[in-house]
Amino acid sequence: MKKISLLFLICGLFLVSSCIPTQTIKGDGNITTENIPVSEYDCLELEGGGMVVNYTQSDAPEGLEIKTDRNIFEKYEFNVENHKLKIRPKKEFRKHTNFRPTEFMVTANSRNLKKLAAAGSTHVNINSPLQAEEFEAGLAGSGIIQFHDTASFTNLKIEIAGSGDFVGHKVYCEELNGDMAGSNTIVLGGTVGIAEFSI
């Protein structure tokens, strides 16, 4: 059921992000940096174009910093619901809108991370060692999820639809399950006990 739920989530985000846009909103060049208070979360749901996310697993209190054009910032929402940090356009801009920010940098940290779902052309960098019993990563569109340090899991699930890439050169897990649809790539290094892929 978890696998099906994540597939529905990333495919749903992909459908939203891949609709033919009726309007394009370009960044106005007025770059602003905002620190947004957030409650505890262990899941990231990301949707948008041109977003670069830098995540760190840390014992420090949860934090979120957004750096982007003022007119882009005003059309996005940033909130935590049921331990899920959601970064996405406001409801009236989720369909038929193409965002072209001058810059869209997200810096986030939390104590735990169990699930990551990204849609659109989002580039997610995991910049610290990451540990979790179970971890689910979902990509829809042309995004990238990249682990820059050691990642250790008991169970790892990777699901990609579109032309996205998953990269991790120091991944250690007992069991790996991967689902790939489209012209995507999974690049892994490290040690895996059991691996199963559906292509």
Region spans (language model):
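Intrinsically disordered, low-complexity terminal regions
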Residues: 1-199
